[in-house]
Amino acid sequence: MHSRQRIVHGVLILALLGTFAGLTSCELFPPPTPTTPPSPIDFARVLDYAQRSALVYDSDEVIRQKASPGATVTISPATPTGVKAYVETNDANKVQWVVVRGTSNLANVKLDVDYNKVVDPRLQVPLHKGFAEAALVVYHFVKTLLKPGYETRVTGHSLGGAAAVIVLMLLKEDGVTLGPAMTFGQPKVTNRQGAAKYRSLPLLRFVNDKDPVPLMPPLDLFSLLDEGPFQHFGPEVVLGNGTMYQYYPEHQAERFSVTSFWQTLGQQEIPDHPIARYIQSLQQKIGH
């Protein structure tokens, strides 16, 4: 953006700050009302996805040992930033899985937050630059392994979930047969334009009630004036204690302030964010 435009935008931001002073994000953007899901959520099936999202954090040997019987598993080498993926192919039922692990360093969510407007000529939507770069590495790894006509299921946790969503977008453009995709504790990857274009994807996002990572990156007034703020797409299931959960047909507004959390991201523990905590919550939903 040119410096003069930035100055004008800066003046507008000051005006907006004056207008919105004292208002919370929930007051600016009223949260949607939880609804009944179109069909009952099969938490046993969701747990299957979450366990794969956990497995990708293990060693290659453990991944192969714990893969489904009769499945073929191909594992990517980890990148210097820790991004890794594996493809699990089951020829008997013609199902293939793409499981993505992102970097374990949450501070990387803050890196390269600028939108990259042309990540791939097929997408043409703004994306979080860091997530897009990770997703492209995974995409180039998996695209030669996927078998035509097989149902393709995509999953990932945290930053791996963010990369998994972008991989899902790319696979849609390839005409791949997509099965249900599920992510856990996934941060935002695109803006309103991207959300509108890809909201028909078979994506279901799971969020622990006190996990702030899915609220990242937070609302920023500069982004309101540029490409627009980061925004989720796909229904959201907020996991509460015990058997409690709420279903939202779209992302709900921020449940709590994340400004201070964003400033110290990567420097503190987040008890509700680890994949083990998601698995524990899902097990409670099915009585384990």
What function would you assign to each model-found segment?
Residues C26-T155, L159-H288:
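Non-catalytic, mobile gating and regulatory segments of ester bond hydrolases
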Residues V11-G22:
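Bacterial N-terminal signal peptides
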